[in-house]
A protein has these predicted regions:
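Short beta-strand segments at enzyme active-site cores
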Residues: 59-64, 89, 126-132, 165-166
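Active-site groove signature of glycoside hydrolases
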Residues: 119-139
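Beta/alpha (TIM)-barrel catalytic core signal, keyed to glycine-rich beta->alpha loops juxtaposed to Asp/Glu
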Residues: 3, 7-10, 135-290
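Active-site mouth loops of central-metabolism enzymes
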Residues: 30-43, 98-109, 138-141
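N-terminal binding-site loop/beta-alpha segment at the start of enzyme catalytic domains
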Residues: 1-86
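Short, well-ordered coil/turn segments that N-cap beta-strands
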Residues: 19-23, 56-58, 83-86, 124-128, ...
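Short, acidic/polar
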Residues: 38-52, 106-121, 170-174
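A short, structured active-site edge motif that brings together acidic residues
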Residues: 85-98
Length: 290
């Protein structure tokens, strides 16, 4: 499966030399149940990471609050010293409670500690890209991001961060963010049924900024899932493959980070770049959006 990930094309983050294959990998599912603790099978998790990179994935999404600490430590164990050209994108702005809850962590000290935790657990001196995560679980909440983003900009000037992105944000928050630091990517919930960001995707594409959707199969009703299943079967694809293929065809600035803890599912996801969606099927899928 050499360079399978490259078949989806590539995108260069604005103002950088980082050219990423559009099919990346999200490490969230490598942790244990509820994204807590170690995986049931560490060797399998290591195999998934190594196979992803062998297949041409050069963009891994992670965070030190996955586990916590678990996915970053697995990435280091599997891939360090890192191959040339591999870009590791991490997130800060949240933490895990002792009850496994997801809590905001946006104070100055929490952000500084999070960056240093990521550096230590990934075995890096500088983080390639750090996304500032704000808002709710899946929905952005409009409000000022000046204070936390200013902290990341300071850490960038200190050489601890190369580039900055935003996660779970609104267009107005992006505008505010761009007045503080150069923003190379936006990571929001978006898929064939969650279409609130349609205009945002197009605006970012016009500016040359990457859009990285998470939850490619999230938010489907049973009826919508059934329609997706039928459309996928008609194309001899899995529903996930069709959902990913739709995103790839939606806009050239979209970068994918599907996650899995299975080598078999990793291979299936990478095959999504081969799925060609006829115009009629695209119309059927577009009718699902809300």
């Amino acid at each position: 499966m050499p360079q399978q990930a490259a078949l989806a094309g590539h995108f260069t983050l604005p103002g950088t030399s980082m050219t990423l294959n559009r099919m990346g990998y999200g490490a969230m599912q490598l942790a244990g149940p509820q994204v807590w603790g170690p995986p049931r099978d560490v060797a399998a998790a290591i195999s998934v990471l190594r196979e992803a990179v062998d297949a041409g994935v050069n963009h891994i999404d992670t965070s030190d609050y996955y586990g916590p600490h678990v996915t970053n430590q697995l990435i280091k164990q599997a891939l360090h010293p890192y191959p040339e050209g591999l870009v590791i994108v991490t997130k800060v702005g949240a933490r895990r409670g002792a009850d496994k809850s997801w809590l905001p962590a946006l104070s100055r000290q929490e952000l500084i500690d999070a960056v240093h935790d990521n550096l230590r657990n990934l075995g890096l001196d500088t983080l390639d890209v750090v996304n500032l995560r704000v808002g709710g679980f899946m929905e952005p909440s409009d409000g000022s991001i000046e204070a936390p983003l200013t902290v990341l900009a300071e850490l960038q000037r200190q050489g601890l961060i190369r580039h900055i992105g935003l996660s779970n944000v609104t267009p107005s928050q992006l505008a505010q963010g761009q007045s503080i630091a150069a923003i190379v990517c936006v990571q929001n919930a978006y898929n064939v049924v969650l279409r609130k960001d349609d205009g945002f995707v197009d605006d970012l594409a016009a500016r040359g900024i990457a859009y990285v959707p998470f939850f490619p199969m999230g938010g489907f009703t049973p009826v919508q899932s059934s329609i997706l299943d039928d459309a996928a079967a008609s194309l001899h694809a899995t529903p996930m493959q069709l959902a990913l293929a739709w995103l790839l065809q939606r806009s050239p600035n979209i970068l994918l980070i599907p996650g899995t803890s299975s080598v078999a599912h990793l291979r299936e996801n990478l095959e999504a770049s081969k799925v060609e969606i006829p115009r009629k099927v695209i119309g059927d899928l577009d009718s699902l959006g809300r």
